[in-house]
């Protein structure tokens, strides 16, 4: 986590660099923060068209192993997805969070995969969030997300907040 001011200067961070360190990319208070460019194979999920989403899925599944987990594919293909969000997209599509690429392709669920992907990320484009804290039945917090999480069913208690800063 990196906190920056309006000019992208680092105010604080969860882990700052040492000035004398030999890190290629130093993270120090007062320095301008420049995020790393996205790897070429990972693209932003925001503003993604259905055609692009489906073409990328097909290209990946044509070259890989059909048993490859769909959530892992989403993590490798799109920047900014968390493992929780990737599993949630797959869960909303297939009813399980560990479905394979082949399972989704064989069951004709690719369009539904896109619709669930879009259902999570279209609100983000409009700065609409559903901050959600997930607790185990004993009250222990184990997940936090910007959107509703359904994959845990009755094994989790969801606590919704009005804003991300609550």
Regions found by a protein language model. Give the residues of each.
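Extended, highly charged segments
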Residues: 1-166
């Amino acid at each position: 986590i990196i906190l920056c001011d309006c000019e992208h200067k680092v105010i604080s961070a969860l882990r700052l660099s040492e000035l004398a360190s030999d890190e290629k990319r130093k993270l120090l208070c007062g320095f301008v923060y420049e995020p790393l460019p996205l790897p070429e194979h990972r693209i932003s999920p925001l503003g993604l068209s259905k055609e692009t989403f489906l073409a990328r899925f097909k290209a990946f599944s044509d070259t890989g192993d059909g048993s490859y987990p769909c959530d892992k594919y989403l993590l490798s293909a799109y920047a900014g997805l968390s493992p929780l969000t990737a599993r949630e997209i797959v869960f909303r599509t297939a009813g399980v969070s560990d479905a394979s690429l082949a399972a989704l392709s064989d069951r004709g669920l690719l369009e539904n995969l896109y619709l669930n992907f879009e259902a999570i990320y279209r609100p983000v484009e409009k700065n609409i969030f559903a901050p959600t804290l997930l607790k185990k039945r004993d009250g222990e917090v184990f997940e936090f997300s910007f959107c509703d999480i359904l994959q845990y069913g009755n094994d989790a208690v969801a606590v919704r907040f009005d804003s991300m800063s609550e």
